Amino acid sequence: MTVHFIGAGPGAPDLITLRGRDLIAACPVCLYAGSLVPAEIVAFAAQDARVIDTAPLNLDQIMGEIEMAHNNNQDVARVHSGDPSLYGAIGEQIKRLKALDIDYTITPGVPAFAACAAALGLELTLPDISQTIILTRTAMKSSAMPAGEDLANLGRSGATLAIHLSARNLRQVCRDLIPHYGADCPVAFIYRASWPDQEIIRGTLIDIREKVRAAKLTRTALVLVGRVLDTDQATDSRLYAPDHRHILRPEG
């Protein structure tokens, strides 16, 4: 018996990996976060599969379902939104699986920041503008951020920021970043990237909060901050330069 942690991707059913889809179809038990994983993803499960929405369950209850499946020698598809390695809370589940000597696998998924970049139609790593992306969040009701990982510190890098779980914390986001990025720094607020009701709000650090408040969007969004969001000044990369030689493009 094996528990398969599966990244469902950002939302669109056709953005799940083939491996993820096939594992959901093959497992007799499917546990999924109903608040974040669309019904179309869960529909890949077999008709006779036991499908359980874990949104109202705590960790002990989720593990109880897994232990029941283990006792019945039934594989489990544990479906998480996005990529399970990012804010998927799989760490505590893995710790318990190891204690119970239950095998597990992890199938990656398309992460939210990649879906947001696609929705915006841009590259996040432009030469001379930004070559670094920091994936982070802010602390509200969730666990505290480790020392040194607050936005005031991360902002000193000037890197492009992909800020998760912070739709209701834009006041702090803007307050902490304006000293490092400037009030005119572009910001994109992407609500439910790749879902049918996806919304994109563009602004700057000085006005994005008011724009989001006016749209009455308070959850399930990612905030991108950086100059890459609004520039045509980037130089071309060296990758395709005529004088750039490598083993597959020898001189002449």
Spans of features found by a protein language model:
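Short secondary-structure boundary/capping segments
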Residues: 21, 43, 68, 124-126, ...
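Class I S-adenosyl-L-methionine
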Residues: 1-110, 115
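A generic local structural motif
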Residues: 15-20, 38-39, 63-65, 121-122, ...
